[in-house]
Amino acid sequence: MSFASETKKELTHMDVSDSDAKVELAAFIRMNGAISFSSQLVIMDVQTENAAIARRMYQLLKDLYEVPIELLVRRKMKLKKNNVYIVRLKSGTRGILEDLRILEPPMTFTKSIDRGFVKKRSAKRAYLRGAFLASGSVNNPETSSYHLEIFSVYEEHNEAICALMNQFDLNARTLERKNGFITYLKEAEKITEFLSIIGATSALLHFEDVRIMRDMRNSVNRLVNCETANLNKTINAAVRQIDNIKYIQSTVGLEALPERLREIAALRIANEDVTLKELGEMLTTGQVSKSGINHRLRKLDQIAERLRSGETPAQVGLKISNS
């Protein structure tokens, strides 16, 4: 089962007050309900592919309204042949839709969210929970990117959902899609806040556990990469230094070098694997800092390069013994 499905399953087990149940129902029906007319009856079908959600919608309607409710199961014939669950109302439909602020007399559908209906903070949470159950999705936190969205067919309703989410400082944004509009979150912290708002505590804890482990792995990888890069840099520098010192040795001899350069040159080729700090501690003329050792080795690099370019030892500042 996907992370989104697990989250929705958790939400279907929540106990809510009657007032919050109405708001949750209103959001779900507003987004997943369909109205049809037959023999002067107003028929409402609420459709979902999630059995747990269908049971919740059925139970909420049954608890709130004393009307006959049908629960139908159909099988999709195209693509994924999943079951489709339909909660159907054939009587009292109009009154229920008006009570849920989805329909206004005489038969006008509301385009947005009734502000009075979501005045209380718990009602705001309930509406977002219903909207997420209806058409929400959230990426598994183990995937490469964080993403949570709620889809709506109507732009005005989508904008209202975005505004409702941002009353909780979620920094939600909207985007037009091919068949409608979405309100979405991209920041991990905001996604966990949203999960907390709608009451998905277990999903939130799982999301945070995975996110923390993922961030730790990323930090370790960055540290390892940085240390590897520094190690490679150190090794390359040591190889270059030894190569240059051996070139000086083979062309003019180390004896031509000034004493302070001659000593470090001899130590470097005799101790290829030691650090600059360790080289500084080996000097018989007195301990020298890491930066001081680095300065002397750079001077040896410069001498080798000048000799390679054709300059004479005298031009480089070296004294060649005639004996």
From Swiss-Prot:
Annotated protein name in UniProt: Probable cell division protein WhiA
GO MF term (any one): DNA binding
Keywords: Cell cycle, Cell division, DNA-binding
Source superkingdom: Bacteria
Family to which the UniProt record says this protein belongs: Belongs to the WhiA family.
Function description: Involved in cell division and chromosome segregation.
GO biological process: cell division; regulation of sporulation
DNA bind region: 275-309
